[in-house]
Amino acid sequence: MKFKSIISTITLLCLLFLASCVYNKKTSLEAFKQDVYTPEYATGFKILGAKNAQSTLIQVSNPWQGAKNVTMSYFISRNGELPPTGFTGPTIPAGAQHIVCMSSSYIAMLDALGQVDRIVAVSGINYIANPYILAHRDSIKDMGPEINYELLLGLKPDVVLLYGIGDAQTAVTDKLKELAIPYMYVGEYLEESPLGKAEWLVALSELTDSRDKGIDVFREIPKRYQALKDLTASVEQRPTVMFNTP
């Protein structure tokens, strides 16, 4: 009986060791070619996966005005999986709990997902109307128009959500890399359609490990959009609307 117990223990340890080896095995970058989520309206991102991998890649295309043939990839790590061989972009832990939003648009997306409470800092808090942010402005930090890196380090964020403004943003991302702070460009403002802009909430839901919820939330938006569009189809006098003005 004792001999059988020893054999069973050794077998169990071997299985655990093998599982650990597979668990931490690196997947090649070329293996991430399976479509996990292909947007219907947005053109600036897609989510890719690989066989036998829980982690995913978010690919962001041309994330600022004037960008051409620019593709950035972000590794969304799950279950301790390592970035694929040859990957040099940011690694972001799935289920991000501490998020810095450098645009109010990202706040609205996280709010739609029911995850606005994960925001630890914003840019320009005095110009944000979100009820949760206003109610917690004593604890949510303000990065200001330019990132306060000392403050940012103290927050230990899981990810900083950025908008791209061309070469001027390079200094920011270089500094974030130096500080080992994960970041992701969100290019929703470059989408031509309102639905394309809204669909970026699915990309954010991948960061918070709630992709299914993100897809469900977004699926309802085109229905409401079409209903409002139909409602105004017969309006003859159409006013000019100006927004994002001082």
Label each region the model flagged.
Residues I92, N148, D158-L161, I165-P246:
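Extracytoplasmic substrate-binding proteins
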Residues C21-S105, K213-V241:
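Bacterial Sec-exported substrate-binding components of ABC uptake systems
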Residues K51, N62, S123-N126, G187, ...:
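Residues at the C-termini of beta-strands that transition into short coil/loop
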